[in-house]
């Protein structure tokens, strides 16, 4: 079961990824984790990646694809894997195909931007402890104050509305072509494209996922 996950930041992708991994016993493959592991292990691709990063440049698709190919050849990927954060572009999607990676399912979690902004912008944090709250879904006992210490809660930079909107803009620009690409792949019978309503309750989305992947 080889899966690609698509979904905007705040669409609940991470939560459902954990569910799929636990339910079907497949690992999540994150390009960031792979890069760090290859650099630490000092592999040939790791050395190439390190020299590029040290020079302040972006790691090329060729290196990333090489790492993906190495990673999915490992024993824990025998039953499948979950690709998160890759591919991000059409050349990367083409590259996956060229190195012979067959994708069984492309799963999109669809949530309107306005809902994501509400989800993210309502978050409040107590930085010292890491405790987080939400004005609507998980409010503190006293507005703006941490339940335990009574100290002020803050809005993290990442959760500010303008930051969230900027990240969503980047996501849509990058992902709209991929959604069209995998839609065509599904029409051609090369993969299955599944779309879920990410505004539903977590347990409901998980149940729908389990049914679709069974």
UniProtKB/Swiss-Prot annotation:
Catalyzes the reversible transfer of the terminal phosphate group between ATP and AMP. Plays an important role in cellular energy homeostasis and in adenine nucleotide metabolism. It catalyses: AMP + ATP = 2 ADP. Keywords: ATP-binding, Cytoplasm, Kinase, Nucleotide biosynthesis, Nucleotide-binding, Transferase. Pathway: Purine metabolism; AMP biosynthesis via salvage pathway; AMP from ADP: step 1/1. Monomer. This is Adenylate kinase. The keyword Kinase applies. AMP binds at residues 31, 36, 57-59, 85-88, 92, 156, 167. One of its GO terms (biological process) is AMP salvage. ATP binds at residues 10-15, 123, 132-133, 200. One of its GO terms (cellular component) is cytoplasm. HAMAP family: Adenylate_kinase_Adk. Its main location: cytoplasm. Consists of three domains, a large central CORE domain and two small peripheral domains, NMPbind and LID, which undergo movements during catalysis. The LID domain closes over the site of phosphoryl transfer upon ATP binding. Assembling and dissambling the active center during each catalytic cycle provides an effective means to prevent ATP hydrolysis. Residues 122-159 are annotated as: LID. It is found in: Cytoplasm. Belongs to the adenylate kinase family. The keyword Cytoplasm applies. Residues 30-59 are annotated as: NMP. One of its GO terms (molecular function) is ATP binding. It is an enzyme of class 2 (transferase). InterPro entries: Adenyl_kin_sub, Adenylat/UMP-CMP_kin, Adenylat_kinase_CS, Adenylate_kinase_lid-dom, P-loop_NTPase. Its EC number is 2.7.4.3.
């Amino acid at each position: 079961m080889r899966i690609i996950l698509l979904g905007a930041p705040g669409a609940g992708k991470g939560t459902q990824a954990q569910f799929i991994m636990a339910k079907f016993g497949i690992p999540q493959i994150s390009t960031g984790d792979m890069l760090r592991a290859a650099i630490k292990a000092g592999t040939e691709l790791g050395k190439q990646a390190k020299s590029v990063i040290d020079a302040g440049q972006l790691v090329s698709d060729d290196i990333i694809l090489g790492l993906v190919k190495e990673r999915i050849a490992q024993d824990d990927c025998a039953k499948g894997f979950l690709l998160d954060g890759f591919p991000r572009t059409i050349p990367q999607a083409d590259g996956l195909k060229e190195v012979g990676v067959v994708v069984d399912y492309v799963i999109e979690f669809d949530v309107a931007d306005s809902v994501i902004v509400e989800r993210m912008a309502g978050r409040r944090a107590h930085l010292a402890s890491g405790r987080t709250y939400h004005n609507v879904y998980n409010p503190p006992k006293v507005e703006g104050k941490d339940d335990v210490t009574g100290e002020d809660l803050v809005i993290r930079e990442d959760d500010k509305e303008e930051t969230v909107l900027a990240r969503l803009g980047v996501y849509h620009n990058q992902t709209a072509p991929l959604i069209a690409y995998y839609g065509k792949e599904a029409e051609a019978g090369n993969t299955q494209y599944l779309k879920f309503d990410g505004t539903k309750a977590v347990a409901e989305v998980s149940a729908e996922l389990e049914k679709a992947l069974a």
